[in-house]
Amino acid sequence: ELQVRLVRFGYSIAACRDPVMMRITATSLSQEHLVIACSLTGITPELLGAVELARSYGAPILAITRADSPLARLADVVLPLQGAETSFIYKPTAARYGMLLAIDVLATELALAHPEDNQERLRRVKLALDDYRGGDDHLPLGD
């Protein structure tokens, strides 16, 4: 979701889910890059290792995770998640919705930082998708 949001605003972004690719990507980063690490728990060993590597090469870290987690302690900036989970396992986790909200807030703030440029970018995305999908003018800006 974060990749889809940020690429619309012209950001070069690579979403890595594979632990080997996370480590390889981390070694290519510097202080000119930003790592945005998203984790509902903040304790996944593979993610923590990649973030530590990126940090060792000078990349700043923004974490969207639990405020009291190891990932949060590695980050320069934290967008904290605090989802009150229950034992009812048949519903989506509250933390998942918190993650989506944090991504929405981050994407909105980045969009508003350069409103004219981003309005034009979003217009282009909308036209390209409408042309491709053949739908009416009221379809979502995405998919």
Regions of interest found by a model, annotated:
Residues 112-143:
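Internal, active-site/partner-interface "lid" segment
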Residues 1-101, 107-112:
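Glycine-rich phosphate-binding loops that contact phosphosugars or nucleotide phosphates
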